[in-house]
Amino acid sequence: RGTQSDGHDFIPDAVAKGASAVVCEQLPAETAHGVAYVVVPDAAGALADMAAAFYGHPSRELKLVGITGTNGKTTTATLLYDLVRALGYKAGLVSTVVYKVGERIVEATHTTPDPVRLNAMMREMADEGCEYCFMECSSHAIVQQRTRGLHFAGGIFSNITHDHLDYHKTFAEYIRAKKLFFDSLAKDAFALTNADDKNGRVMVQNTAAGIHTYSLRTMADFRCKIVEMHVDGMLLRIDGQEVWVGLVGRFNAYNLLAVYGAAVLLGLDRAEVLRAMSMLHAVSGRFEFVRAENGTTAIVDYAHTPDALENVIQTIQEIRTPTQQLIVVCGCGGDRDRTKRPEICLLY
């Protein structure tokens, strides 16, 4: 059963169109001759298991890293993809903006696609020689078991703030959804969590994976300090080494530190990782600068939560000149979490 309709209602249509087998949670009132009916306790979970098996468990042939959290998933996943490519490796990417099999672009339909499409893409990645895959794991996808049956080399937790309460109903349920991802990691995987988020430790408290932390404020396995921030980039000190990066904002310092930590945990050389980080650039639609001919500078960002928008505004305040006027235009998508809209308006 889905959130909008019951899949059992469509069994007759599927049979009429030639389905020879039906996986369901309960037998329909009328069964068709010559059609096999397999009753399972959880059809969504069964679909994920079947998809992984049908495509030969391609995730086992990749170093798959899942990124979950309210903000920063797309940037972290994309930067990891760009980083390993800069180091000479082939990789795949599954993100809100785009799916990539090596360098081939595939149109993205969801942050995390359904298990059949997901495993089909990973089979293409493995067959085309990709060694890594970096994937956003949305809370919807985790609860709906789209990531079930996948073997993750590691998972990253960015942060958790007010979002998706239209679906999860309560913040506690939203936290639980994110935590389920880390609960499912195997003991040979790593769980990299943001120690500066008050729920960072909660996320990994029941995981079997090796736990690692990153922080800008406290003791952690991976630490970072912003030395300088300018309109065209930042000077960061990571693990005692300074590196200039072409991204701006404290939130991006967290994203970059997560990228560094994950790369090291994947076995990449620290010095080579820092060198590659200096070549990274902002992700499309994430604090992206657009300069008009009249001298006006626009910054396009996906910020759609109170916390994300506040971070963007704060970063702009830090880098703009005293004479520059700040005008904020923000939209909230329809049929989604309405409770965050008043909080967003209060930021103005």
Residue ranges and their predicted role:
Residues R1-D49, K198, A220-I226, E242, ...:
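N-terminal leader/targeting and accessory segments in enzymes
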Residues Q26-P28, T96-V97, S139, I160, ...:
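Short, ordered loop/turn segments at secondary-structure junctions
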Residues I11, Y81, M122, K178, ...:
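Generic hydrophobic/aromatic pocket-lining and core-packing "Φ" positions
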Residues H230-V231, L236, Q241-L347:
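Nucleotide phosphate-binding/pyrophosphate-handling subdomain across enzymes
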Residues A46-A195, N199-T207, D239, L257, ...:
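Phosphate-binding loop of NTP-binding sites
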Residues S20-Q26, A191-A195, I327-C330:
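Short internal beta-strands
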